[in-house]
Every structure is written in structure tokens, then in C-alpha cells.
UniProtKB/Swiss-Prot annotation:
GO terms for biological process: cell wall organization. It is found in: Secreted; Secreted, Cell wall. This is Class I hydrophobin ssgA. Keywords: Cell wall, Cell wall biogenesis/degradation, Disulfide bond, Secreted, Signal, Stress response. Residues 1-19 form the signal peptide. Induction: Expression is induced during nutrient deprivation and during formation of infection structures. The keyword Cell wall biogenesis/degradation applies. Self-assembles to form functional amyloid fibrils called rodlets. Self-assembly into fibrillar rodlets occurs spontaneously at hydrophobic:hydrophilic interfaces and the rodlets further associate laterally to form amphipathic monolayers. It comes from Metarhizium anisopliae.
Length: 96
């Protein structure tokens, strides 16, 4: 009886959905940047531990304000940034 109860509780716990944050809910502690060019990480030039994208060519810090600064290009969140000239490595595209 006790074994059946444990198995039932484990099945219920495994079936409970967990909510994954959408891209709009993602926290970006290191800063949001506006990139004119965003390239996918190919693993050849970019270090293996980098995230999904690199951001290069004209970076500026984006302030999310409805009236003033807006990014007309791709906004990205950069974590564990490795900067080499004008290219930031470890940037993930986000929707603002």
C-alpha cells in the first residue's frame, strides 16, 4: 500500500506542468543591447561556452521606454560577455 502511494505521488508530481518564462519575461541582468547585425554561433570562431548568438556592429544600451529610445534592429541580452573589438559574444535575441 505504501509503495503504491509513493508511486502515485511521484506520477502526480511528474505530471504537474511548470511554466517556462517567455522571451518577454526573461530577466536580463547584464544589459540589453541593440545590434545592427546578429550572427548565429557557428562554434568555429566563437568559443564553445558562448550562448546562441554574437552581436556586432554598432552597439548601444537599450532603455525600454515607450517615448524615447527604441531599437529598430535586433535587441539581445548578453550574459558572460566576451568582447573582442566591436563583437559581443554570448548574446541571446529577445523581444522588447
Amino acid at each position: 500500500m505504501f509503495k503504491a502511494l509513493i508511486v502515485a505521488l511521484a506520477a502526480v508530481a511528474a505530471a504537474i506542468p511548470t511554466q517556462q518564462p517567455s522571451s518577454n519575461e526573461m530577466n536580463c541582468d547584464s544589459g540589453v543591447y541593440c545590434c545592427n547585425k546578429v550572427a548565429q554561433n557557428t562554434g568555429i570562431v566563437v568559443p564553445i561556452d558562448a550562448l546562441s548568438s554574437t552581436c556586432g556592429d554598432t552597439l548601444k544600451l537599450v532603455t525600454v521606454d515607450a517615448l524615447n529610445d527604441k531599437c529598430t534592429s535586433q535587441t539581445v541580452c548578453c550574459n558572460n560577455v566576451q568582447q573582442n573589438g566591436l563583437v559581443n559574444v554570448a548574446c541571446t535575441p529577445i523581444d522588447v
